[in-house]
Amino acid sequence: VPNDFGVVSLCITDDRFIHHPYRRGVYMRDSEGDRNPELFFVLREAVEAIDAFLQEGRQVVVHCHGGRSRTTFVLKAWYMLREGKTHAEAHQWVGDEWPLYETWTRTFLDVLDNEWSDYVEAVHREWP
């Protein structure tokens, strides 16, 4: 990854990216149930990291171990918030853009369908 890119890591990376100057680690597990306490807030932190890098004029790399579930969970949330889209629309967008996309983590889907959708709606009501 070029040094001027922002990197949002969603998994344990060991020493990878340790010296990368623009990096945010937001750890989440690709697991069902309560293995991700406060998942909504972790998701919001990841989306805010993407936006912060973009506001700095950086290209952004969002990644997890396999690039299938956590990465697309965060990218769907970002798209929903930035574009005012529904989870179904974000699902279509990611599916069209990313061939590795998979949806096996029901907990992620539930957060996007409920808490995140409510958050997106509330934010867009407040925006002029």
Where are the model-predicted features located?
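Cysteine-based protein phosphatase catalytic domain of the PTP/DSP
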Residues: 1-60, 77-112, 116-120, 127
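Short cysteine clusters
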Residues: 64
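Glycine-rich nucleophile elbow surrounding the catalytic serine of serine-hydrolase chemistry
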Residues: 68-73
